[in-house]
Amino acid sequence: MKHLLTLTDLTKNEISNILEVATQMRRIVAANYKKGPQLIGNVVAGIFPSPNLSSTAMQLATTYLSGTPCSVFGINDELGQCHTFDSMGVNTLVINCANDNLAKSFAGKSRCGVINGGSSQYDPIGVLADLMALNARLDGLQNLNVLAVGNRDVNKINELIHCLQLYGSNLIWFLPPDDFVTTRKGIVLDKAETAFAGADAVIDLGLAAFSEAEKYYGSVGGISEAFMDKARIRCPLLGSRYVVDNVGIKEYTHNIVSSRETCYVSVLMAVLYLMHKD
């Protein structure tokens, strides 16, 4: 694997291989002594708009594999910084930038490996982390109906649709009928009761600015517990730790947010290892 730009370019075998290696890497993350020798002598650089999950995971993943991390934040000339890192001889570059074309165009002529750490249309590491967390909780990714709710982190949608279809599963997206701004992709339902009914897992994408939470979640404070009750028993929830009942906001027992954060680091470790190995 030379680059990882989008999961829509990968086959089922390639995705399964990353998840399998990530499962092994998770043992390092869970261990008291978090060190593996896989990236000794390697430099992993990152370009990020500000400190975030992607930048933190890059630092941890590289350190856990005995590599050397190097990050910059808030750079105006991202492409120029990419070329600077490449000329410095870094082994891998993680790019977290809204511009979808940046990572792709740079990867076409770079000497270093390139990982898309999140852009306006794609989030390969984040989606793999979602899949890994769901795989662990649901004992596989086959024959699932996964429900996405919200309209903020829509850069996950295309890759989730692609990956779940490879495993014979479906992504269903709930959007209220009066959301005329969000571009609809895949299977979209506009009735919450129908969308949540029988869902095997729920992913909260968050809400864009000026969106009315009650129209998406059934309540102002987050996803309504009444909606979650329509899903399968012990339905896992990603993207949020909380639901809202008739009393107020409470932690949802079956949320897997913490597991997903661990999976995010593990997946990035797996990708770094596979790129170095090849």
Report the location of each language-model feature.
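Adenosine-phosphate binding glycine-rich loop
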Residues: 239-278
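Positively charged, low-complexity intrinsically disordered leader regions
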Residues: 1-51
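Short hydrophobic/aromatic-enriched beta-strand-loop microsegments
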Residues: 112-118, 171-172, 253-259
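Phosphate/diphosphate ligand-binding glycine-rich loop within oxidoreductases
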Residues: 33-135, 233, 244-247
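Glycine-rich phosphate/diphosphate-binding loop of Rossmann-like nucleotide-binding domains
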Residues: 48-56, 136-205
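Short, charged, surface-exposed secondary-structure boundary motifs
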Residues: 123-129, 182-184, 266-270
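Rossmann-like adenosine-cofactor binding region
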Residues: 183-254
